[in-house]
Amino acid sequence: MGHVAPHASKKEHVAPHAAEKDHVAPHASKKEHVAPHAAEKGQVAPYAAGEGQVAPNAAGERPVAPYAAGEGQVAPYAAGEGQVAPYAAGEGQVAPYAAGEGQVAPYAAGEAQVAPHAAGEGRVAPHAAGDGQVEHCTVEDREEGHIGTTEQGHMSHYTSKLEHMAPPSAQTEAVVSYVAGERHAPPDCTVSGPAMCCSAEARQTTPDWTTTGPEISQGTLPGLTVLHVGGTWQTFAAEDEPCVTTLLSPVKPLSSSRKYAPYNLQIPSYSESEPQAHKGLSSETFGPCEPLHINQLPSSLLLKIFSNLSLNERCILASLVCKYWRDLCLDSQFWKQLDLSNRQQIKDNILEEIASRSQNITEINISDCFSVSDQGVCVVALKCPGLVKYTAYRCKQLSDISLIALAAHCPSLQKVHVGNQDKLSDEALIQMGRRCKELKDIHFGQCYKISDEGLIVIAKGCQKLQKIYMQENKLVSDESVKAFAEHCPGLQYVGFMGCSVTSEGVINLTKLKHLSSLDLRHITELDNETVMEIVKQCQHLTSLNLCLNRSINDRCVEVIAKEGRSLKELYLVTCKITDYALIAIGRYSKSIETVDVGWCKEITDYGAKQIAQSSKSIRYLGLMRCDKVNEATVEQLVQQYPHITFSTVLQDCKRTLERAYQMGWTPNASPAT
């Protein structure tokens, strides 16, 4: 037959992966030919075609450029008359990953079949040894540029022009597993040494093969050359040990027709010793390649995936898939921060089981869980001594027993938010003040039995407090305010909405140099002078809420605008102010971003226009039920100052509808009349 260069394309020459009569090359398709991963005679593996069809990347009388379709050709992702699109199964064809009667799923090998890189009579496998098969050549053959025969009719090959491929002192071997046909361009690649290509044409076309790009990772199969973690090609022998590693980065395409050629190229790196990449490989080396099941992933990786699920998704969906997933969903790391709020099915027994499975719970929220009793909370306190945050709003069935248990067994408690619990009294607060020295954040809104007695104990015992919020606690007076101002100098957030405090107690808050947020809503005996003094003394104040205080007037707001240099939020709903207050804010304040003057009956169009025009910092202006502000004026301001959000009934409705449309909501079509 004569000598054949590896990339020659004459009829009686043999190139790796080239197809001639009675020979089968990977990715080639002729009548009675079998492409890699294909099964019985007359069947077609993925990316292959049947009689009269051409598989992409195949060589023969009808070479096909990848992704291009012409007469008698098949583009990999296009199907026309007499053509086969990949992953499509027709008569006498096999869809990948599907096996039926007379069909073979990919990666399976049987009689008259060829596994990738395997050897059989009359077949060409690039890295296997058998009759009529191809082996790689050594550098000593480089001068001759031919294919020489070895014992038992074996053939060795190499590219006739390798002068540019290897340093003078190195031995070089190159096995090209994707080149076939009469005319072809060399694929792109990046190697761990000087640039390598397969012909002079390639050197002219692509002078620099090294490019950059994100690394790509795929799985590895024994005996196959695959793209491995880290952006390298690795050839694996039967023992699943890497024999050849070639650095690879995603490369720029050589041409549009060979865009993805680099991922089918196999080039061993330079080596001073005899390479071992293809030693002892045979058809028995390769077992069937099974797709990786998700449960074969390391448990640590599955836990990381499950951490992105919500509690409902883990408990209701993922845990029902299989026992393994259920066990993973019960891992203690998922039970540190529990939000069980508004779940009526949560009862004491469920709470006890959760606490028994994970004693690492640090946060728990049982708001609106009306079936949880003091007993369930006591079990949590006993079994979870590391509890840091406890939230229980509107659990009217709970009493002092719950908080006393938490105070006794959870010394690290830092946050306690308990609201609207009629049974809670000073007894629980006294125990917390004596035991919970790390307490930093407490909310006791609408707990009507709490008085100064319990709060003073907390103020004296929990001097690390940073936030305190009381709401409608009529038994809380100026004494509590004085105690917190004296014993808790680190307070940053203070709220006494609707409590029985007066200006006499509030003035003590000027001692809090770190105060940043102050909520004084609905304090009937609050005068303007007290508010102005607090703003002057507390230079770090960023939020001030004075809603529902009819005593606050324009003069007070003017001083706030001048002195509150750090102030960003000012709430004045239902205060006794006029347009002058808005004009003063726009004129004097360079920091205020949010102003709400809803239900202020004396605010008119003029005030709204002036603050929008003069203020450089304003971003939100609340005008809800300011009846003297014309909606047409607001619409004009919206168009003129798009960086400001104007809040009125109509504007809020428009924004709500707009968000609904963005989320895919459509109004019901009116019935035909």
From Swiss-Prot:
Disulfide links within the chain: none
Phenotype on disruption: Impaired nervous system development caused by inability to eliminate aberrant BTB domain-containing protein dimers.
Subcellular location: Cytoplasm; Nucleus
Main location: cytoplasm
Region entry Disordered, spans: 1-39
Keywords: Cytoplasm, Neurogenesis, Nucleus, Ubl conjugation pathway
Extent of Basic and acidic residues compositional bias: 9-39
Cell division listed as a keyword: no
Leader peptide range in chain numbering: none
InterPro entries cross-referenced by the UniProt entry: F-box-like_dom_sf (IPR036047), F-box_dom (IPR001810), F-box_LRR-repeat (IPR050648), Leu-rich_rpt (IPR001611), Leu-rich_rpt_Cys-con_subtyp (IPR006553), LRR_dom_sf (IPR032675)
UniProt keyword annotation of Nucleus present: yes
Pfam families per the UniProt record, alphabetical: F-box-like (PF12937), LRR_6 (PF13516)
Any GO BP annotation: protein ubiquitination
Family: Belongs to the FBXL17 family.
Subunit: Part of the SCF (SKP1-CUL1-F-box) E3 ubiquitin-protein ligase complex SCF(FBXL17). Interacts with BTB domain-containing proteins; specifically recognizes and binds a conserved degron of non-consecutive residues present at the interface of BTB dimers of aberrant composition.
Role summary: Substrate-recognition component of the SCF(FBXL17) E3 ubiquitin ligase complex, a key component of a quality control pathway required to ensure functional dimerization of BTB domain-containing proteins (dimerization quality control, DQC). FBXL17 specifically recognizes and binds a conserved degron of non-consecutive residues present at the interface of BTB dimers of aberrant composition: aberrant BTB dimer are then ubiquitinated by the SCF(FBXL17) complex and degraded by the proteasome.
Protein name: F-box/LRR-repeat protein 17
The organism of origin for this protein: Xenopus laevis (African clawed frog)
Gene (UniProt): fbxl17
